[in-house]
């Protein structure tokens, strides 16, 4: 199956008007003693009409559903404070998901760099939406705006990936290198915001550098409603890039394309739109409900 995919790519490269991603240099076939990696195998799947990976869409759908539920619970406590004690009994049960859910989203975004034809465009769109969220949150909540949220992080990671993936590809690193390296980076810098690197305290000179807010260094004056700096969360993105390079090729790709929950997969195809729109919808609905009940 891999051999057929390579032959297909080679034939298409020699034809006129060949898409850019199939032109020479548009894909990498690197062979080591034990490894064959085909970074553009998924381009063949797109040409055959199988660009969507059902299991990834289903996981994204489940994750965005958890985000919607969690934010709804939080918003209800804002509009109806008397309900807070009872609601947060349920909220406490899913509180650990505050780290797990965005972490999985970031991991999936790294995986999907191998599925997108234009990651630069994805990164610029994320940057545009992140800027809009920063502006709106500064108006709605000037004391605690979203200064560097998850969309800021994804935009930065995607743009960094666009700049670095070709030089890294020329090094012929196996997928596990990115997975292990990204995982270690995440683990070593997980408490960086609290002032620790690999369990050791950071020097005082690195504290309170607001211009390095995006990096994740500790800042006691930081007030942000949603904060996902490059360290540690960028480590999960790079781990996802390696995981995608491994899983999104045969034989694993065939299993991931099999859908078990079409409804959840449809939900997962619109995660960005749902993420951008759900809070205004919750706020408007709860405001109307509170107004109706006096």
How would you label these PLM feature ranges?
Residues 2, 8, 13-28, 32-35:
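Positively charged N-terminal leader segments that act as targeting/secretion signals
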Residues 16, 29-294:
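Alpha-helical transmembrane segments and their immediate juxtamembrane cytosolic regions
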